[in-house]
Curated annotation (Swiss-Prot):
InterPro entries cross-referenced by the UniProt entry: ATP-grasp, ATP-grasp_succ-CoA_synth-type, ATP_grasp_subdomain_1, Succ-CoA_synthase_bsu_CS, SUCC_ACL_C, Succ_CoA_ligase-like_bsu, Succinyl-CoA_synth-like
Domain of life: Bacteria
Gene3D superfamilies: ATP-grasp fold, A domain (3.30.1490.20), ATP-grasp fold, B domain (3.30.470.20), Succinyl-CoA synthetase domains (3.40.50.261)
Entry keyword set: ATP-binding, Ligase, Magnesium, Metal-binding, Nucleotide-binding, Tricarboxylic acid cycle
Reactions listed under catalytic activity: succinate + ATP + CoA = succinyl-CoA + ADP + phosphate; GTP + succinate + CoA = succinyl-CoA + GDP + phosphate
Organism (species): Caulobacter sp. (strain K31)
UniProt-recorded name of the protein: Succinate--CoA ligase [ADP-forming] subunit beta
Recorded name of the encoding gene: sucC
Lineage: Bacteria, Pseudomonadati, Pseudomonadota, Alphaproteobacteria, Caulobacterales
Domain ATP-grasp: 9-254
Length: 399
């Protein structure tokens, strides 16, 4: 789960991280009130969307010379003018795609005198089962661009959760960023604060870009992005309360209500599969036959008829879907339950696109019999390759 920048900074501030003062604003009036509280002399008006590249982004409906989604201004009146221009508009960045995202809230923050910019992040390293710390002197840029152009400027080290942060880690961070004296001590303190927050809140990623050195020689978190492990949210009602559903795909929100693992993609063939590995294999073979998957959807090992029906309805709600492939290997999951769910869903929502069903495993013959006797126009497949080939042919033939 992702949260907005202003929320991320509030979370980090709880652990003592140095963040600039600022206030969220949902209206122009709230933006003005925030600026008046801050007092100036410099304000930063930031669009709050779940995407990077806001500063270089462009608002739809404004000219090519218009300012982006992060604006530095020097008066309360300028805050008012820019807030009025930004709120309610769609901001397009390199991460949003051409559709962009509507700006429904702003963050009005005090300006900072910047001497240097750094990059700092904490990530879960699944290979080593440790927390990976990534640091670079090239802050304020996309880390992917830095990795491509100057990989030698990216430094990383791992922290073992069994032992936590040691002085050696602090020295490694200071060396990576070229910090000495008081700034090196501040970096050591900050690393401890960030690591504690990372573990305490079950984060999947903590990214600060940029982490700055101010002109009076102090570290400050100028921008922050936090992502949380969705499977651990039950332990953090405070974090769960920060969820902004307007930033998420409605289909993914609906899927979460049924504990379905659903991720929307850009293809034309909807997939309903049980098991993450089989789901990925299904997506791969669809691509092998020349089409693109419209989603990743894992119904899990113990899905009920109602859960399968919900999954089918979520897939068909995507207007980009031109065909559906159901691929089930019944171990814990029974094929007859899948068949009943598919039939119930088709009868409820109707079937406007080709549907191929491949069943194998527990009660497979009963499942096939249920589908065969349903009277619905469902194409049966013998195996995964056969199913992928049939759905791709059906979709391309209907095009």
């Amino acid at each position: 789960m992702n949260i907005h920048e202003h929320q991320a900074k509030a979370v980090l501030a709880e652990f003592g991280a140095p963040v600039p003062r600022g206030y969220p604003a949902f209206t122009v009036e709230e933006a003005v009130a925030a600026a008046e509280k801050l007092g100036g002399p410099v304000f930063v008006v930031k669009s709050q969307i779940h995407a990077g590249g806001r500063g270089k982004g462009k608002f739809k409906g404004l000219g090519p010379d218009a300012k982006g989604g992060v604006r530095v201004v020097k008066s309360v009146e300028d805050v008012k003018t820019n807030a009025a221009e930004m709120l309610g508009r769609v901001l397009v960045t390199h991460q949003t795609g051409p559709k962009g995202k509507q700006v429904n809230r702003l963050y009005v923050e005090e300006g900072a005198a910047i001497a240097k910019e750094f990059y700092l992040s904490l990530l879960v390293d699944r290979e080593t089962s440790m927390v990976s710390v990534v640091a670079s002197t090239e802050g304020g840029m996309d880390i992917e661009d830095v990795a491509h152009a100057t990989p030698e400027k990216i430094h990383s080290f791992s922290i073992d959760p069994a032992t936590g942060v040691w002085p050696t880690h602090a020295r490694a961070l200071a060396k990576a960023l070229g910090l000495t004296g008081g700034l090196a001590k501040e970096a050591a303190t900050l690393l401890g604060q960030l690591y504690t927050a990372f573990l305490a809140k079950d984060m999947a990623m903590l990214e600060i870009n940029p982490l700055i050195v101010t002109e009076d020689d102090h570290l400050k978190v100028l921008d922050a992005k936090l992502s949380f492990d969705g499977n651990a949210l039950y332990r953090h009602p405070d974090i769960r309360a920060l969820r902004d559903e307007s930033e998420e795909d409605p289909k993914e929100i609906e899927a979460s209500k049924y504990d379905l693992a659903y991720i929307a993609l850009d293809g034309e063939i909807g997939c309903m599969v049980n098991g993450a590995g089989l789901a990925m294999a299904t997506m791969d073979i669809i691509k092998l036959y020349g089409a693109e998957p419209a989603n990743f959807l894992d119904v899990g090992g113990g899905a009920s008829k109602e859960k399968v029906t919900a999954a089918f309805k979520i897939i068909t709600a995507d207007p980009a879907v031109k065909g559906i492939l159901v691929n089930i290997f019944g171990g814990i999951m029974r094929c007859d339950i899948i068949a009943e769910g598919v039939i119930a869903a088709v009868k409820e929502v109707g079937l406007q696109v080709p549907l191929v069903v491949r069943l194998e495993g527990t009660n497979v013959e009963l499942g096939k019999k249920i589908i065969r006797e349903s009277g619905l126009n469902v194409i049966a497949a013998n195996d995964l390759s056969d199913g992928a080939e049939k759905i791709v042919k059906a979709v391309k033939g209907a095009a």
